Amino acid sequence: MEKQIVNEPKEIDGYRVVQDGKEIYEALSKGETVMHWESGDSMYPILMHMEYCKIHPAKKQEINKGDAVFCKFLYRNEERKISDFYMVHRCTDIVVRGDEYYFKIECTDNTLFGWTKDVYGVAESTNIFQDEEALWK
């Protein structure tokens, strides 16, 4: 499949493009599949810099080690308040205790982000890329 470059589309292949993490969470919660691009190389070679990924809702039991997942962590912001931080990253381990699933989230270079119970979807590579230069014009 040939690499395709696009410039801030509203929709790709019939899926809505969403960049805001909370909006992605809300869409997945309603059963909607969305497109989203990430920057940086922390997911290479699963996802490339500026590549759109298709994120579809997934039940915790459907997540596998090695999947790129859309998940949530809690962090303390500049005002020292706890906030949600949503991201697409790789699941490297899964622990199940009773009904609870815990997912270990890392970069592809094995940098650990931590463990979370909050995984909402699986992200797939598309070979469609955001035109990075167009973002800066």
List PLM regions with ranges.
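Extended hydrophobic leader/signal-anchor segments used for secretion and membrane insertion
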Residues: M1-K137
